[in-house]
Amino acid sequence: MYHPKALIIALLFSLSLILAAKSAEQLQIGVKYVPEECPVKSRKGDRLSMHYTGTLAKDGSKFDSSLDRNRPFEFTLGAGQVIKGWDQGLLDMCISEKRKLTIPSHLAYGERGHPPVIPPQSTLVFEVELLGIKNRHVDEL
């Protein structure tokens, strides 16, 4: 005979496993710092200047960093020039804002990976800072 409490505990445990699996499949955006003033936020079509450090979620090993090159990375947001997790995770960002992006493999390099530094099916973690939006100014609000 089943005990109602045991059944409820089993259901809650199953639900927590399902939710954990779902969150591993979704982009996670952690805001680390937001400036007090934010007159302009990033949007699709903006030319962004970023600093970033990328690591593998499984072991924390660093695979790339603009800081190591002492040179910001520039790209156009939403133009497909970067992985999908960046195009999604860097929207509505303030200049000087810092975020931590945890990007599941299907929004990064997927089944192929990016050999030799990023294995297939890798979840990636990026610490990012928006240094500037090159094509817009405060007066364009």
Swiss-Prot record:
It catalyses: [protein]-peptidylproline (omega=180) = [protein]-peptidylproline (omega=0). Keywords: Endoplasmic reticulum, Isomerase, Rotamase, Signal. Residues 45-134 form the PPIase FKBP-type domain. Its EC number is 5.2.1.8. Coiled coil: none annotated. GO terms for cellular component: endoplasmic reticulum. One of its GO terms (molecular function) is peptidyl-prolyl cis-trans isomerase activity. This is FK506-binding protein 2. Inhibited by both FK506 and rapamycin. The keyword Chloroplast does not apply. Disulfide bonds: none annotated. It comes from Cryptococcus neoformans var. neoformans serotype D (strain JEC21 / ATCC MYA-565).
